[in-house]
A protein has these predicted regions:
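Generic alpha-helical secondary structure signal
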Residues: 17, 29, 33, 60, ...
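Contiguous mid-protein beta-loop-alpha structural module that forms a pocket-lining wall or clamp
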Residues: 69-76, 80-169
């Protein structure tokens, strides 16, 4: 049955130079083909992962890796951060790669020769937005509409993160209905002419997961629509 089997595929990067440097043998074309074949079966969940902070992958190239994997639309896109464990290959080459990392668990990289600390913070912001809106499975229809506005999924989540941060939404706990208000507010900021499409997408997402007895305050009142429909049917 759907979801009984789950595959976890450690892509880590789509940058050839990075893949070679970490001594992996992987043909990306084969990975894409396999992922799409499994996806077509619609009965196996796929979790694909990316690692930020790997050698030879700067901020812009990591964005490309993110976009490449997001385009496959796995059930989960797990964005992790390079860990430098004592005795590991990365530990032995930390100086060469300019790795700055936590010396206590979880030993994650904070910056490197290729990615600055500020850039790593931006990637962490993307990871938080990805978890809240994509990996949670709660806003998939909304995101499908929003993606049409963006050439880069990474930039989409980054803009969303900046919006959350600038409005003080990051440090607060929000229920699902409140979060729909926030993402609708964001959509109006970046794609003002299509509010109705975002509203319909959010209503679908909301009721797909839970049966709510009341509609969100921003949703259109269906009573008027019902009256119009009844009047039309009586007249015809």
């Amino acid at each position: 049955r759907p979801g009984l089997i789950q595959l976890e595929i450690g892509v880590q990067s789509t940058n050839g130079a990075t893949i070679r440097e970490i001594h992996r043998t992987m043909r990306l074309e084969d990975v894409y083909r396999a992922v799409n074949r499994v996806k077509a079966g619609k009965n196996i969940h796929q979790h694909l992962d990316l690692i930020a902070g790997l050698p030879f992958e700067d901020y812009e190239r990591f964005q490309q890796s993110f976009d490449d994997i997001y385009a496959l639309h796995p059930q989960q896109l797990q964005l992790g951060f390079l860990k430098v464990l004592k005795g590991s290959y990365m530990y032995e080459h930390a100086s060469e790669y300019g790795l700055i990392y936590r010396t206590k668990p979880p030993y994650e990289v904070l910056a490197s020769k290729w990615v600055s600390y500020d850039e790593m913070l931006e990637i962490r912001l993307v990871e938080e937005m990805l978890e809240l809106h994509y990996n949670s499975g709660q806003f998939l229809t909304y995101l499908a509409v929003l993606e049409q506005r963006y050439a880069s999924a990474f930039q989409m989540f980054l803009d969303m993160g900046h919006f959350y941060r600038s409005h003080g939404y990051l440090d607060c706990s929000h229920n699902r209905v409140r979060r729909t208000e926030i993402v609708l507010e964001f959509a109006e900021r970046v794609d003002a002419g299509h509010r109705a499409a975002y509203e319909e997408a959010l209503i679908f997402d909301l009721y797909k997961i839970e049966k709510s007895k009341s509609r969100p305050i921003w949703a259109r009142d269906l009573a008027l629509e019902k009256k119009k429909t009844s009047a039309y049917l009586r007249a015809h």
